Curated annotation (Swiss-Prot):
<feature type="binding site">
    <location>
        <begin position="104"/>
        <end position="105"/>
    </location>
    <ligand>
        <name>substrate</name>
    </ligand>
</feature>
<protein>
    <recommendedName>
        <fullName>3-dehydroquinate dehydratase</fullName>
        <ecNumber>4.2.1.10</ecNumber>
    </recommendedName>
</protein>
<feature type="site" description="Transition state stabilizer">
    <location>
        <position position="21"/>
    </location>
</feature>
<dbReference type="InterPro" id="IPR036441">
    <property type="entry name" value="DHquinase_II_sf"/>
</dbReference>
<comment type="pathway">
    <text>Metabolic intermediate biosynthesis; chorismate biosynthesis; chorismate from D-erythrose 4-phosphate and phosphoenolpyruvate: step 3/7.</text>
</comment>
<feature type="binding site">
    <location>
        <position position="90"/>
    </location>
    <ligand>
        <name>substrate</name>
    </ligand>
</feature>
<dbReference type="GO" id="GO:0003855">
    <property type="term" value="F:3-dehydroquinate dehydratase activity"/>
</dbReference>
<dbReference type="GO" id="GO:0008652">
    <property type="term" value="P:amino acid biosynthetic process"/>
</dbReference>
<feature type="binding site">
    <location>
        <position position="77"/>
    </location>
    <ligand>
        <name>substrate</name>
    </ligand>
</feature>
<keyword id="KW-0028">Amino-acid biosynthesis</keyword>
<comment type="function">
    <text>Catalyzes a trans-dehydration via an enolate intermediate.</text>
</comment>
<comment type="subunit">
    <text>Homododecamer.</text>
</comment>
<dbReference type="InterPro" id="IPR001874">
    <property type="entry name" value="DHquinase_II"/>
</dbReference>
<dbReference type="GO" id="GO:0019631">
    <property type="term" value="P:quinate catabolic process"/>
</dbReference>
<dbReference type="GO" id="GO:0009423">
    <property type="term" value="P:chorismate biosynthetic process"/>
</dbReference>
<dbReference type="InterPro" id="IPR018509">
    <property type="entry name" value="DHquinase_II_CS"/>
</dbReference>
<keyword id="KW-0057">Aromatic amino acid biosynthesis</keyword>
Length: 149
């Protein structure tokens, strides 16, 4: 791992409503609480953490493009874009930054349209159904992978 590795956490549409939206699926934590916990975890590991949440696909794509050469690992919860966005997939493949896909709910136990991901087959790993803790596991895994380099 370099002196100060950088990890980017990307969150897709409607995740700004965490804590309000369908808590039976997504839990009671707000996105701010999740990001605060990740920031502390990253700080304790000596890693820089950046975060972006957007309801706009193009903003997530632009953030991925801007990450090239600057970010060492991406953690992404593409939310509904998981099932629709070839563009996000292409952006991630284009910059060739390793990434982990995270979902708060178990997408495989939900509606059939949520079972397909355009990202999973290219991800270093996929974590779903573990709520906010899934982000912490993803960050730990990303840090471990960077340390193994």
């Amino acid at each position: 791992m370099s002196a100060k590795s950088r990890i980017l956490v990307l969150n897709g549409p409607n995740l700004n409503l965490l804590g309000l939206r369908e808590p039976t699926h997504y839990g009671n934590n707000t996105l701010a609480q999740i990001v605060d916990a990740l920031t502390e975890q990253a700080h304790n590991a000596g890693v820089e953490l950046e975060h972006l949440q957007s309801n706009r696909e193009y903003e997530l794509i632009e953030a991925i493009h801007a990450a090239y050469g600057k970010i060492d690992f991406i953690i992404i919860n593409p939310a509904a874009f998981t099932h629709t966005s070839v563009a996000l997939r292409d952006a991630l493949l284009g910059v060739a930054i390793p990434f982990i896909e995270v979902h708060l709910s178990n997408v495989h136990a939900r509606e059939p349209f949520r079972h397909h991901s355009y990202l999973s087959d290219k991800a270093e790993g996929v974590i779903c159904g573990l709520g906010a803790q899934g982000y912490e596991f993803a960050l730990s895994a990303a840090i471990n992978k960077l340390q193994a380099k």
